[in-house]
């Protein structure tokens, strides 16, 4: 018995510390032994502690969204739209703000989007005729970036105009989300997946590179269409030359019959002049074939009936069937050879053309499953022939088929130059040309090699300092004289002497010689992008976050005006003015925060955009959203909710991520509070929160496509704003006038926050006297 007692005491002594340790882990702030042994009190304390923690969490969120802050935001709200940070996307937001204010960029994107929308409609028509499989998905994927940019531009313009029209409806910050563009970049380059910080210069090159590829693709397709169109014109001109004598001898009462003759293969009418019996058999055969196609061709026949033709029923049926044969003729490569056969002889080619037409009729009998497409081709051929008749003077075309096609041909000739400019958007705005000139020091011969460039990377300090710092264990901040931007450009375009082992092989001297190599500007773009090399490789052990790239905070004197005549191949008087700067604050390339400073100028260009604002918000809002089968599953609102956070494609993981990892995500990207990131899941579109009349029309337009319904919606939107269309134009002029108040001022875009910066403060931040952590990273100069 006495031995049992110590064993129990030992058991208690061994058991009680384990209980204390287990409870002390839950309540490490209160380590009292009495409460640790009392289980009832511990459960009550646990419930109280959980309630207390819940109250603390509940109290943190309203503190960030207090009412005085919102009141200050409402008072200081500027009529310029910011971009929400979607998780370390400050690098993208700063570049998008610069591109938005870049002169000519919005007009070029809009022009490309209009071309793409027509291409998409043509692809839909082709899908009815032929199933091309995956061939149609590649161009759509390349068009996605242009459509995403246009959608973002429209949303920014709408939000800006609606704020100026109804400022009292905005209770939160004026910002929108570039979610669709971000997901497009992630599809084009998987490097942008996740929520890591990236380089602003790299994302700029990615955007411009994809736009350039899209322009090249559109240009190739346009050239292909022009060659096909020219081949059609050549074939029809050759056919008209054959029947020129016959049509000139016809009387005025049979001019409509002349038009029908030109629709037919020319050999048939020559065969009719030789013998009438053959054509009678042909008419009977054609009339039999046209009966099953009569229902599908009522629309075309009604157009021709409305013209007032005095022909009988059988002549109306003949040109329709044969013109269908002509519509298939340009797609065959052997048609040109057959037309060349028709040239030398006058009688015999009519027999060959007769057999050719019979062969095409048999093919039309086999392909009866495509009457609608053939009908569309028939209308196009009739319209083109009508235009040719009016030009050549062979006879007036019918009014129903000649009025509108002439306008379309004139539009093509007028817009041809605009399309060429639109296809060269990147080349005209951002791309220049460098000349790498090498001069042999023995024979004085020159060799030149040209390269395209979209930005200029210049140093911010001398290279010798880095060599000195490598030898020393301690790397103090270099104390040198203030360098200027002209010095940096001179280092970029400096003359390099090639000596020693790196001698130049001269083709004139036929041996290795010493040479001088220089870099000059041959062609300058409208916008010069200067990349300051603020990040340098460092072998420091504590630099574990930057990947060996540390920040160089050496200040560089940056002028507001710049001339590159000193480094040009030919004399020029072009001068450039600074209009945008991307700033970086931080110590490494993979951390920190990006902001953009933009100077508000050229509001006349904004006035042109606002003049088209009524058209955009009535007609083009719903077009950019559904691009392929995956995105066509829902509207833009559902699209944003589906891919707000790429965890599993569902909405629940996004909520969990918002609750747990908001603080960790927002530190590097520059989020000031949780509300800036939670806006991604709570409100997928800030326009939806505001509830402006423009957004109501946008949501309704994505579901309907009829012109009558669009006109009704335009009337409803005008009723909601209390003004008509002319009143909207007056409001738009008021919008532009209110924006002119900020002309010449510098705006600081810090994600969703927009502030006005005085020019003195901006110059101090641009060329500081000390070495701050916030330094310029990208400089944008436009041609004055």
UniProtKB/Swiss-Prot annotation:
Record-annotated USP domain positions: 81-784
PTMs per UniProt: Autocatalytic cleavage of USP1 following UV irradiation inactivates it, leading to an increase in ubiquitinated PCNA, recruitment of POLH and translesion synthesis.
GO biological process, one term: proteolysis
Modified residues (Phosphoserine): 16, 42, 67, 475, 767
Residues annotated as site: Cleavage: 670-671
Keywords for the protein's UniProt record, in alphabetical order: Autocatalytic cleavage, DNA damage, DNA repair, Hydrolase, Nucleus, Phosphoprotein, Protease, Thiol protease, Ubl conjugation, Ubl conjugation pathway
Cell compartment(s), UniProt: Nucleus
GO cellular component: cytosol; nucleoplasm; nucleus
Biased composition (Polar residues): 7-16, 389-407, 694-709
Residue numbers spanned by region Disordered: 1-21, 33-54, 232-341, 363-411, 686-723
Keyword NAD among UniProt keywords: no
Family statement: Belongs to the peptidase C19 family.
UniProt subunit comment: Interacts with FANCD2 and PCNA. Interacts with WDR48. Interacts with ATAD5; the interaction regulates USP1-mediated PCNA deubiquitination.
Protein name (record): Ubiquitin carboxyl-terminal hydrolase 1
Organism: Rattus norvegicus (Rat)
Lineage start: Eukaryota, Metazoa, Chordata, Craniata, Vertebrata
